[in-house]
Swiss-Prot record:
Domain of life according to the entry: Eukaryota
Name used for this protein in its record: U2-sicaritoxin-Li1b
Organism field: Loxosceles intermedia (Brown spider)
Family recorded in the similarity comment: Belongs to the neurotoxin 39 family.
Maturation-removed propeptide residues: 21-33
A Gene Ontology molecular function term of the record: sodium channel regulator activity
Length: 86
């Protein structure tokens, strides 16, 4: 009886840990929930998508440049999602 109870507890803990890892992974990649805001990390160096929001403030380099989102009103649409303002 004790062995069966022990196995049930171990099985329940294994399920709990598996679901906890999924929650942690979903918090690591906020980019999947929408576009990435200007100044935040993006692109393959960080294992993230390159869909940057346009926050209408930055006037220099545009899109996902050197692993950071930089978008603004003077930027071409390269890598920036102009449908969603940051």
């Amino acid at each position: 009886m004790k062995i069966e109870l022990f196995l049930v507890v171990i099985f329940a803990l294994a399920i709990h840990m598996a679901t906890a890892e999924e929650v942690i992974e979903s918090d690591i990649e906020p980019a999947e929930r929408g576009c990435i805001k200007s100044g935040q990390r993006c692109g393959s160096p960080h294992g993230l998508p390159s869909n940057c929001c346009d926050d209408w403030k930055y006037k220099g380099r545009c899109g996902c440049t050197m692993g950071v989102c930089t978008c603004g009103k003077n930027c071409p649409s390269r890598g920036c999602d102009y449908r969603t303002k940051g």
